[in-house]
């Protein structure tokens, strides 16, 4: 899921009162941190999501091409800044597998309906997916405000990530001929108000709705054909961590992605991985092995 997101605070400040005050920067940090991870440094949290992927192209109906099962294992650590105060940084790994929309079995290969070419499926294995620190004061010095909405006992927290940047597969002349990576990810979190504001609890039982609008995945080999993909999924934090994930994900982690049982270290300084950079690594490794 990519994915990127939010911020929070340290355990001593979050637990110093019985109720988190969303109107204060410290309260905003604590609430965001409870939704995203935990107010306890180094406590692993697992998000799971399940959904569908549709192909969308001009002039033809949308087509259900994949189901998906995904997870993200994360932890947060407290950070401080002399000008911006106390905050936190989130580190994570993210795995999402593509499933046959009829059988719900893991896809290892896929037949491109436009070309009838059988291609290897490259699942999402982004390690790491880390966030920038968030502090009690923003970059311009303003006090941090909680961006969620409280209504009828629920807290709703929307987050949109418009993505437009140089495509790692697009060559050296994108500023002249185009081909930038252009996508949108939308994360909508929801949590019970009493759960979120309870300062004695380090984590919230949060739910998430995730939408992604993106170009064709590079492993699909769609070339320059017009169109793209729409992802739609819902999920939540897992009370039992990795053990609470669906069997298909647990089996895939055990067999092919053993590092995904734990998050990266809190001091992880690696650049973030994306579906496009991961595909490049897989493709380049296979091409080198074939030579």
Residue spans for each PLM region:
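Gram-negative bacterial Sec-dependent N-terminal signal peptides
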Residues: 1-13
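Generic detection of intrinsically disordered/low-complexity segments and helix-coil linkers/edges
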Residues: 3, 16, 41-43, 92, ...
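N-terminal segment immediately downstream of the Sec signal-peptide cleavage site
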Residues: 18-95, 232-291
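Predominantly extracellular/secreted and cell-surface proteins with exposed
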Residues: 51-198
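A eukaryote-biased signal for long
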Residues: 156-291
